[in-house]
Curated annotation (Swiss-Prot):
Highest rank taxon of the organism: Bacteria
Protein family per UniProt: Belongs to the class-I aminoacyl-tRNA synthetase family. IleS type 1 subfamily.
One MF term in the entry's GO annotations: tRNA binding
GO biological process: isoleucyl-tRNA aminoacylation
Cofactor: binding comment: Binds 1 zinc ion per subunit.
Domain notes: IleRS has two distinct active sites: one for aminoacylation and one for editing. The misactivated valine is translocated from the active site to the editing site, which sterically excludes the correctly activated isoleucine. The single editing site contains two valyl binding pockets, one specific for each substrate (Val-AMP or Val-tRNA(Ile)).
Name recorded for this polypeptide: Isoleucine--tRNA ligase
Sorted UniProt keywords: Aminoacyl-tRNA synthetase, ATP-binding, Cytoplasm, Ligase, Metal-binding, Nucleotide-binding, Protein biosynthesis, Zinc
Chain span(s) of sequence motif 'KMSKS' region: 593-597
Catalyses which reaction(s): tRNA(Ile) + L-isoleucine + ATP = L-isoleucyl-tRNA(Ile) + AMP + diphosphate
Residues that coordinate or bind L-isoleucyl-5'-AMP: E552
């Protein structure tokens, strides 16, 4: 027998190296085969429901780091809630309609106009489903648990039917209307866009000042006076029918050479500098209200432009007189309608000037800027041309600029129930709190929602037209269409004639001959996803409406959060969510947006292959995702190191509780040593803190609290101290079993606490814990206990940890001075102040063991510390090399080695342990 055979060295098959890239897939396969998600749902039947509703990602392409951040965050919450007393089903979803899929098919050579609409839409459906399969694999590879076999998909028949019913509920209340209004128009995709489909990029635009000659100055201005406007869209000058001024502002007529001009008084100096007027002389000052209904000559066409009053005119830029084209601007439209101006669009669907822009027909609008500017110059109306770069709206899919263009569209009136939506926002809890203001302001300031789209791949608007062109939006017809969609899918709209889509025997006074046509436009995709609260939450029996939480990127304040709120309040009167948690974007290590063109993209698959999905999950738990998050390979390397520390500490506890049977070896709390009870109290604190942080969705605090406890409390202190007991004492020694009791309790609690973040690692530890549940994911979160001596222990041991820290400094200095090597070579004498002396009396533990030294003594109170002592605020410390020899079993420096003649190699403590437990060693001696 060798000396090491008498030690209780921890042994385990739990590997030091995680092998995450390989082993995670094995665990994920087991979860699927054993239906762990379904088992968890069954366990939670009858418990209160927590409903996190998944915002559907678009089914196009593999997932990126933003997807990973979002889906893992959701998974952490759902796993935690499921383990903490809630029934928390998670149904993933996908958004499948819209332009990107049409674009992908075009790239593959599919020609939409060379096939039937139903054949084309079938290709779109097939592409979407193939992308869903790809993304489902990606999400599951991240360890995300959910009902992956029964996701919700916006192209599902029942989903489309529910969406039609949401539309019907809005129509019934009078919120849907048909109108000619300027809307965001994407010439690159030939369709209207919602505000949520707009993104801003810098663009270079012309900046022109144009003079309109007064025709009727209402007795205030002569006809030799010019009204000066400023615009950055020369192509809209042919659509000009008016000039708008603010009734409250002061305006001036100024003489410049032999010309007279009118600008806002406050902007005169700036305009004069821009145009190059020298010494403009003010002739008159008057209010904007005095100019109301004056007229001026259009600089290009034989018609007049009307001067109008409106409050939207500001002094931020320009001249204080606003070029007004009712067909190409929202404010222009509002004031134009008020004054009875025509609403004319001078651009067609593809962005080319049309017949309403004589002289420029067939010219692309951006090219027309140059031609129109030249025409203005030729007429003597151009006062200044310049160029500047500014933030300009672009199509979020094609990345091309968009324009405002008046078209006849279907709208949802926000004004009709705006106050109701704003009141609903007050019922929602927002994290971060600024989200409430952001969403409130967006709803308060937004215009009506244009819900029609001129595309092929989407849910048709369930609207019919009578013989006289009257739209038919009736409860009976809408419900019938919803039933048809539920049975056959929305393709039925394109497969059948209008009469075959109407209820049998349907008649309408506007169609005396029984002839009907159907709407060709489809729904805005935001109406698709925005109807999920009814199509999914209210429709599926295992789910519930409203949701407890919507968790998405901060761009969804103008997207899914927004559209869902509008449709939900319209259809049901309440918000679809009780809480919103928003996240920032994932950027590269330099804070730049990730893009293929910059070559700075990092995809989850790459990180999974190098580090494992567990490292991505741990990274998600360490970042503050309420704002933008930087991502680099270095981040994951650092996270991998943090993971290694967590794993190694847990592995140590697994190894050193291998011979511990919790059923028979557990030591009651009251019988534990002081340091053991202190660690139980600390564990209790950790359980409370971690669960509080989970409840607040504060993953960073969860991770920091767990890691700090593992690394600082356990690895750097308790487990280090425990080695002298767990390794050295007899297997069933009460002190050893006491420390194993603490280790096992910590390991069990921490494994449960890390399961939502590190599920693969938790499952790897779980079999060693001998628990009744087959998987950690099926266990419940640990409950904090109540210990009567908690505050007393925390007070005592807080003082001891300060004391220990100072002794460690003294040991480090002794090591630097070559007095000792390891701390076990040290003999420590302390000269404490009275409070420290009292604390050491209260600790009630072997201080030498706690300091991991071979000798420790407290000098008598009357003894003066020697000059060579290390001085601290409340004590002095002397460190010497301990007298004696190193015991080969406990590694302490002892003066009593050989005192037992039967075991002359050992110190008296080790000899007594070996003699009592290993008689062969006494009889035969140790092998060399």
């Amino acid at each position: 027998m060798k000396i090491k055979d008498t030690l209780n060295m921890g042994k385990t098959s739990f590997p030091m190296r995680a092998g995450l890239p390989k082993n995670e897939s094995i665990w994920q396969k087991k979860w699927d085969e054993d239906h762990v998600y379904e088992q968890r749902q069954k366990l939670n039947e009858g418990k209160p429901t927590f409903m996190l509703h998944d915002g559907p990602p678009f089914a196009n392409g593999n997932i990126h780091m933003g997807h990973a951040l979002n889906k893992i965050s959701k998974d952490i919450i759902v796993r935690y809630k499921s383990m903490n007393g809630f029934r928390a089903p998670y149904v993933p979803g996908w958004d499948t309609h819209g332009l990107p899929i049409e674009q992908q098919l075009a790239k593959q050579g599919v020609k939409r106009k060379e096939m039937s609409m139903t054949d084309y839409r079938e290709l779109c459906r097939q592409f979407a489903m193939q992308e869903i399969d790809k993304q489902r694999t990606d999400f599951k590879r991240l360890g995300v648990m959910g009902d992956w076999e029964h996701p919700y998909i916006t192209l599902q028949h029942h989903y489309e039917a529910s969406e039609i019913r949401v539309f019907g509920a809005m129509a019934k209340k009078g919120y849907i209307y048909h109108g000619l209004k300027p809307v965001y128009w994407s010439w690159s995709s030939e369709s209207t866009l919602a505000e949520a489909e707009i993104e801003y990029h810098d663009d270079k635009s012309p900046s022109i000042y144009v003079a309109f000659k007064v025709v009727d100055g209402k007795g205030l201005l002569d006809t030799d006076t010019y009204l000066v406007i400023w615009t950055t869209t020369p192509w809209t000058i042919p659509a000009n029918y008016g000039i708008t001024v603010n009734p409250r502002f002061d305006y001036v007529q100024v003489q410049v050479g032999d010309k007279k001009y009118v600008v806002a008084a406050e902007l005169l100096d700036r305009v004069a500098e821009e145009i190059g007027w020298e010494n403009p002389k003010i002739l008159k000052t008057f209010k904007g209200t005095d100019m109301d209904k004056m007229t001026a000559q259009h600089p290009l066409y034989d018609r007049t432009s009307l001067v109008m009053n409106a409050d939207h005119v500001t002094l931020d830029a320009g001249t204080g007189l606003v070029h007004t084209a009712p067909g190409h601007g929202e404010d222009d439209y509002k004031v134009g309608v008020k004054y009875g101006l025509p609403v004319v669009s001078v651009v067609d669907a593809k962005g080319y000037m049309n017949e309403y822009a004589p002289g420029f027909e067939g010219v692309f609008y951006d090219d027309a800027n140059k031609q129109i500017t030249q025409a203005l110059a030729d007429k003597g109306a151009l006062l200044k041309l310049d160029f500047f770069t500014h933030s300009y709206p672009h199509d979020w899919r094609t990345k091309k600029p968009v324009i405002f263009r008046a078209t006849t569209q279907w709208f949802a009136s926000i004004d009709a129930f705006r106050d109701q939506i704003l009141k609903a926002i007050d019922t929602v809890d927002f994290k971060p709190s600024w989200g409430k203001t952001r969403l409130y302001n967006m709803i308060r300031d937004r215009g009506d929602w244009v819900i029609s789209r001129q595309r092929a791949w989407g849910v048709p608007l369930p609207i019919f037209y009578a013989e006289d062109g009257e739209p038919i939006i009736e409860e009976e017809t809408i419900n019938h269409v919803a039933d048809l969609f539920g049975k056959y899918g929305s393709n039925v709209w394109f497969e059948r004639e209008a009469k075959d889509l109407l209820p049998e025997g349907y008649t309408n006074p506007h169609s005396p001959n029984g002839q009907f046509t159907k709407e060709k436009d489809i729904m805005d995709v935001w109406f698709d996803s925005g109807s999920s609260h009814q199509a999914v939450l209210a429709a599926r029996p295992e789910l519930s409406f409203p949701a407890d939480l919507y968790l998405e990127g901060s761009d969804q304040y103008r997207g899914w959060f927004n559209s869902s709120l509008i449709t939900s309040v319209a259809a049901t009167g309440v918000a679809p969510y009780r809480g919103i948690l928003s996240q920032g974007f994932t950027l590269d290590g330099k804070g730049r947006k990730m893009s293929k063109s910059l070559g700075n993209t990092i995809v989850p698959a790459t990180i999974e292959k190098q580090f494992g999905a567990e490292i991505i999950r741990l990274w998600v738990a360490t970042v503050d995702s309420s704002s933008d998050v930087r991502v680099s390979v270095d981040n994951f390397a650092q996270t991998s190191e943090a993971y290694r520390k967590i794993r190694n500490t847990m592995r140590f506890m697994v190894a050193n509780t291998g011979d511990f049977d919790p059923e028979k070896d557990t030591v009651a709390y009251d019988e534990l040593g002081s340091v053991d009870r202190y660690m139980m109290v600390r564990l209790n604190q950790i359980i409370k803190q971690v669960k509080t942080a989970y409840d607040a969705y504060d993953f960073a605090t969860v991770e920091k609290t767990i890691s700090s406890f593992l690394v600082n409390d356990l690895s750097a202190f308790y487990l280090d101290v425990a080695k002298d007991v767990v390794y050295i004492e007899a297997k069933d020694d009460p002190k050893r079993r006491g420390m194993q009791t603490v280790m096992f309790a910590a390991l069990l609690a921490l494994t449960k606490l890390i399961t939502p973040i590190l599920p693969h690692t938790a499952e790897e530890v779980w079999p060693y814990l001998k628990q009744p549940e087959a998987y950690a994911a099926l266990a419940d979160m640990p409950e904090a206990e109540q210990f009567d001596d908690e505050s007393q222990l925390l007070d005592i041991w807080s003082g001891f940890m300060d004391f220990r820290s100072e002794v460690q400094k003294a040991l480090e200095l002794a090591r630097d001075n070559k007095v000792i090597g390891k701390s076990l070579e040290a003999a420590v004498t302390v000269y404490p102040s009275e409070p420290v002396r009292d604390m050491l009396d209260d600790v009630d533990a072997n201080v030498m063991q706690l300091l991991i030294t071979s000798h420790f003594e407290i000098a008598p109170a009357t003894t003066q510390a020697p000059a060579n002592a290390e001085q601290f605020d409340d004590m002095a410390v002397v460190v010497k090399h301990a007298d004696g020899e190193v015991c080969p079993r406990c590694r302490m420096v002892r003066t009593d080695i050989g005192t037992d003649p039967k075991l002359p190699q050992l110190c008296s403590r080790c000899a007594a342990i070996v003699e009592a437990n290993f008689p062969d060693a006494v009889t035969n001696g140790f092998d060399k």
